[in-house]
């Protein structure tokens, strides 16, 4: 299995590598690399360890780099003699993916794309991926058995790009009906995904029933303890079955039976009952729809804790935890209940240490695995909960939200944080590490480094690692290149969380990407060090004669440049708005003209990047078997990266720095706002903000419905295009 990974990713020369699987022993996965007589030999305790050991060594000598953006492979004909030490990962499990990834990135993936991703996982030492595809096939069979008609099911499943939130109980029937062909295709796809993961010895995390039921089921069972939950982010309410109701265990057991019969028996089953929802505490569940989930960073409503005694709350939570565990255990006694720990950090108003302990206390320590995913956003949750009350847990970072793609990460933080974690005597049953991004295809250096750390790389110099990384990625390195990357690391790769993504209840990675508002004077702009990023860009451009033939050098240059330039556009937007608001029409016109010119250049520059609007829509339409389905998938795909849905704050949450989005979505929206501002400046009047917002909402919905075709337009000379763009955005 490991050899197959290496052949697919590194080419035919990988056939000469000698791979030897050996017993693991009592510890965690390990590998060891040696070379003699010109041949590379890798021994390891698992297929994943073999693949990762080979890749890690080849990257360290500059022979291979495999990333989402592309690969550079130059395996030598013969290897210098070498004998490495045995490398043992400090983590029993290396986890990967987020339930949201299946909406923000993978809804349109076919087997060829999934095969590449599973290969990437193996190369990076990952052995516990979340495997969420294909579950709607089982849910459909389950609800049919429990009497829900096909007509009602058609008004239950949400569109492909929104499926994760329907599965987690946040929404229901959004962008319904879901084509049956999509359900059938995902069933066949999951068969292949799980077969490959299991062949590699991975331990996929599979879905389980967490309590959410179709509205039609709730209406058909008025005597059941089914609670109407709160409306999440402006969507209509959903329905949750109390685990104390006898129906809960029947449904939960039957789901796992059907799932195992369909896809094979698993060990790890994910059930998140309260993803950005609060547990009903009142005996009759009447508080369920009144509670407001609170995320202070997102500026949403604060939690209103139920007016009940702590003892009643803790008893209720303990009952929930026990029932959720038992529903899985009865179906599969060997199973481990997996849950995300995001809720414990995101809503600390409700999830006090006492509440967390109550929820977990009735579950055997070895039968629950908590994915503590948000330590780059909500640090220290595990400490507040006494390491999750002695349960098994995996430490990790989300990093990416919504698949949005500003350039950021905090490499030194990941190194220092994991070093401190492993040295902490209070970590109890820490068993793993993982990256849990909501979306992929951005900042690949972050994930490359995270999984290096997962195999014990905390003691190595970050600068030395970056030197090896860039040599493998571009073909060679130099002091000048290392100096440029030192600046890049300080300027943008020392940013742990992208704070501008939420600003005054508006989502969007940059100001340009947010729905326009007239009061933007206090927008603080990009974190990090933009002047130092600009210096790094000059250094990279100076290296163009030496590196311009390296595709991944050109890719990275464009990525860093568009990030810097978009931040400059944000500042120019503020200048234009300020000028119009003070009545200086000429200055406003000049500032917005600079914005328009820069955005058009940005749109052209990013046309050669991996993912753009035309590729996203093309992948969506490629899933269709009929013209009607193609149009449906296209609308679904466009909605997610723009309006999202509901009447809350989710618009632009999945904003993208893509060709097509710059020129055809973000710029026209701001043009509407600037027209209103300019007219008010000319007339001496004021802008009706409410009317402007309504006009923008109508324009956004029209854009989603519009069938304008998009095609890829890559720049003929990316280096020259970067030079022109920087000259444009830095002009005064």
What does each model-found stretch correspond to?
Residues 1-91:
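Contiguous, structured surface segment used for ligand recognition
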């Amino acid at each position: 299995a490991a050899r197959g990974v290496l052949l697919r990713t590194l080419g035919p020369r990988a056939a000469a590598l000698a791979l030897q699987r050996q017993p693991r022993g009592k510890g965690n996965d390990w590998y060891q690399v040696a070379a003699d007589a010109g041949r590379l030999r890798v021994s390891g305790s698992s297929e994943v360890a073999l693949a990762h050991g080979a890749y890690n060594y080849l990257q360290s000598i500059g022979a291979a780099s495999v990333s989402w953006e592309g690969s550079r492979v130059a395996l030598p004909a013969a290897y210098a003699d070498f004998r490495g030490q045995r490398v043992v990962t400090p983590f029993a499990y290396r986890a990967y993916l987020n339930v949201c990834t299946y909406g923000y990135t993978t809804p349109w993936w076919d087997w060829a794309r999934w095969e590449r991703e599973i290969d990437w996982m193996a190369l990076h030492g990952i052995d516990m991926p979340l495997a969420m595809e294909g579950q709607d096939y089982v849910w459909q069979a389950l609800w049919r058995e429990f009497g829900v008609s096909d007509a009602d099911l058609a008004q239950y499943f949400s569109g492909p790009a929104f499926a994760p939130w329907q599965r987690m109980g946040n929404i229901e029937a959004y962008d319904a009906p879901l084509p049956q062909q999509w359900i059938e295709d995902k069933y066949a796809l999951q068969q292949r995904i799980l077969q490959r993961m299991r062949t590699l010895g991975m331990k996929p995390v599979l879905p389980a029933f967490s309590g959410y039921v179709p509205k039609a089921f709730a209406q058909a069972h008025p005597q059941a303890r089914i609670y109407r939950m709160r409306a999440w982010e402006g969507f209509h309410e959903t329905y949750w079955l109390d685990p104390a109701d006898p129906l809960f265990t029947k449904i939960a057991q039957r789901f796992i039976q059907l799932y195992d019969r369909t896809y094979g028996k698993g060990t790890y089953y994910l059930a998140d009952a309260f993803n950005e929802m609060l547990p009903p505490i009142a005996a009759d569940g009447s508080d369920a729809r009144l509670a407001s989930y609170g995320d202070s960073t997102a500026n949403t409503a604060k939690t209103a804790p139920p007016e009940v005694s702590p003892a009643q709350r803790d008893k209720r939570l303990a009952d929930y935890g026990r029932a959720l565990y038992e529903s899985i255990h009865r179906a599969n006694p060997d199973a481990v209940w997996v849950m995300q720990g995001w809720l414990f950090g995101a809503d600390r108003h409700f999830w006090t240490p006492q509440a967390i302990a109550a929820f977990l206390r009735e579950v055997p320590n070895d039968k629950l695995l908590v994915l503590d995913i948000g330590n780059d956003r909500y640090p220290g949750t595990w400490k507040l909960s006494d390491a999750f009350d002695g349960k098994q847990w995996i430490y990790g970072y989300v990093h990416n939200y919504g698949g949005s793609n500003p350039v950021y990460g905090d490499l030194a933080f990941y190194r220092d944080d994991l070093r401190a974690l492993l040295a902490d005597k209070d970590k109890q049953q820490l068993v793993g590490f993982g990256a849990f991004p909501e979306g992929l295809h951005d900042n690949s250096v972050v994930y490359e480094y995270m999984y290096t750390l997962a195999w014990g790389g905390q003691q190595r110099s970050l600068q030395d690692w970056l030197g090896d990384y860039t040599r493998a990625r571009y073909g060679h390195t130099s002091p000048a290149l290392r100096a440029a990357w030192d600046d890049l690391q300080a300027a943008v790769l020392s940013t742990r969380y992208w704070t501008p993504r939420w600003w005054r209840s508006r989502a969007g990675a940059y100001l340009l990407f947010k729905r326009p508002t007239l009061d933007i004077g206090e927008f603080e702009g990009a974190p990090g060090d933009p002047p130092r990023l600009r210096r790094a860009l000059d250094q990279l451009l100076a290296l163009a004669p030496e590196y311009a033939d390296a595709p991944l050098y050109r890719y990275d240059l464009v990525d860093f440049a568009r990030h810097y330039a978009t931040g400059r556009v944000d500042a120019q937007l503020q200048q234009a708005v300020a000028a119009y608001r003070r009545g200086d029409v000429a200055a406003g016109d000049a500032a917005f003209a600079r914005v328009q010119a820069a955005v058009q250049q940005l749109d052209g520059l990013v046309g050669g990047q991996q993912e753009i609007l035309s590729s996203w829509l093309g992948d969506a339409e490629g899933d269709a078997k009929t013209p009607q389905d193609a149009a449906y998938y296209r609308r679904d795909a466009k909605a997610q990266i723009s309006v999202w849905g509901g009447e809350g704050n989710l618009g632009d949450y999945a904003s993208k720095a893509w060709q097509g989005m710059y020129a055809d979505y973000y710029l026209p929206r701001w043009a509407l706002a600037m027209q209103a501002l300019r007219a008010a400046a000319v007339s001496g009047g004021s802008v009706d903000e409410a009317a402007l917002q309504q006009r923008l909402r109508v324009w956004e919905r029209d854009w989603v419905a519009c069938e304008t075709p998009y095609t890829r337009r890559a720049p003929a000379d990316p280096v020259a295009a970067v030079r022109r763009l920087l000259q444009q955005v830095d002009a005064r």
